[in-house]
Amino acid sequence: MRRREFIGNLGVLGAAAGSTLFSRGSSALPVQKRPVIAWAGAPPAGAPAGVNVPQFILDLVYGNFVKGLAEFGYEHGRSVDVIKRFDMFSDRVATMEEMVALVKPDVIVAPATLQAVEARKATSTIPIVCGALADAVHLGLIGSEARPGGNVTGIEPYISGLPTNQIELAREIAPTARCLGLLTNMNDPKGPPQVEDLKAACQAIDLSVVEADANTPNDIPGALAALANKKVDVVVVLQTNLLLVRCEQIGAIALEKRLPTVFGYREHVIHGGLVSYGVDLRWCYRRTGYFVDKILRGAHPGDLPIEFPSKLWLAVNLKTAKALDVAIPAALLARGDEVIE
């Protein structure tokens, strides 16, 4: 869509809003003008403009955001208008500043911390909801988790203490392990806190640690090869945006190098990883609908506490276990929320 066409179409949004825009029984409030929600995510794979993400990530992130809106009675084109940043121009991704100026949204939804930081630089007044915040206090996005205080709020999908559980899981699948490999991504705000916690958990049980950092997709093969060359017994992969997006690549290389691998996100296991234990990102992105609803009803984002997932998700891929000749304990399988045959 060209810039002139896009601006022209924006003028039609409000005109399409007639009397009552919500179905009877909907929890959403009737309004005369449909609220506008700006989606600040990246474009899909194959898009002509800028960085793109695989379809399964769009389904995970944007798809569950849409489901979350629906839980509160909101539907694009009927009760709200959702404008995607990557749809604004045909040849590039709009900047956050352009999105704010042209769309004038009532709420901005940012998939992850990077987009939340960019959105916060573009506006200090429009509410911003983030589905996967990290290190938000240190980055100046919020004052505190209990009372954000500014225009940013949302969900933090990292739970302190989770690394200890992941190390315990690693020992379950590799009970004789003495050396653990860490595939890190230290330029992601979520990286350093995880590494610190994982190292502390390993030190507590006298498990040595070897790190290999990957900050671009091209770094991943070399990083996993380095861990294999160091003869690590099991690998823990950090929960970061890059390593999630590249989960298929990581799963394939780990299998090739015969590395039993523990992840934090179930999506890795769906795409060939061995086991995962961590938050369910599907819940995180559905939960953005709750925050959007609260804000559209008049709540200030600074008064909405940051939320954390209350349930952790255990996934096991038995096909990968068989290929790696790893015996998954029956007790672990019995605890599994998701077992891939």
Over which residues does each language-model region extend?
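Short hydrophobic alpha-helices and adjacent helix-cap/hinge residues
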Residues: 1-341
